[in-house]
Amino acid sequence: MAQNSKDAQKRASRAERRAAEAAEMKARAEQMEKERKQQTLIGAIVMAVLVILVAIGAFTVYHNMHKNTETQASTQTVEEAYDKLQQVENTPKLVDKKGGLLISKDGYGKSVEGAPTVAIYMDFLCPGCGNLHRQLDEDLQKMVDAGQINLDLHFMAFMDKWSTDDYSSRAANAAIYLAEHDSDPSHLITFLEKMYAEDFQPEESSNYKSVSDDQIKEQMIASGVSEDVADKAFGRDYQDWLDAIDTYTPKRSELWNTSGTYKDSMTTPTVTINGKFWDMNQLCTCLLYTS
């Protein structure tokens, strides 16, 4: 009788082990299938972004890129420039250590797990940035709202010398102030759309026509920002930080063009997806073979 009881216990133990192993294998298979579907979705979204870039005419963007030659030629190393950036006293609270402002469907600074991150480096006076944003921002907003992407915005202001009134710095400071004092990221994306609108973005150099703070303020309010926030957005609170960004960012070799006229230098606009740099010059070539 005792032997029968022991045998029954052994059989039960073996059955439990087999059941546990089967459950583990099933869970592993389900996880692998989930990861496969996730990677397929990520690949599809990345491809969609690239198709948009090609469709808007990468030629137009590429040939209107701007290179920050002064800061790139600086004798500071990228490590020294990074250290100086971290030492800036009035750093925006929402940006990461490399200057990125992350937006997702969950708000500022909250990454959607599994969604690819699209990073855009821009200057508000840069004509290539205008070409890019005029066609891309609406789609990016839809992808953000759907939780399909995380959007990582990097504001720069090295093109002040191509305006008569520090337009790049004033616009970038206003955008950062907006993000810091208005919790709705859609207001910032709408502000970008309006700032880069063809009937608003000024031309550069000798064709530049002065844009007042009040004109920029109107774009903020039209984007859903309160008058109280808009009124206080022009103190250039983050100028020291922007100056440090303009020195550090162009020295990041992972952002350098890998071909074309601007090879081995950083330009605006720059686009990365999950940290991978997408060379606008190569997108131009892609456009040639797909048109």
Identify the residue ranges that each predicted region occupies:
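Terminal targeting segments of Actinobacterial cell-envelope proteins
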Residues: 1-40
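Hydrophobic membrane-insertion alpha-helices, especially the h-region
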Residues: 46-57
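Short active-site neighborhood of thiol/selenol oxidoreductases, capturing the structured segment around
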Residues: 112-125
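The canonical Cys-X-X-Cys-His
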Residues: 123-130, 271
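Conserved small/polar residues in nucleotide/adenosyl-binding loops
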Residues: 289-290
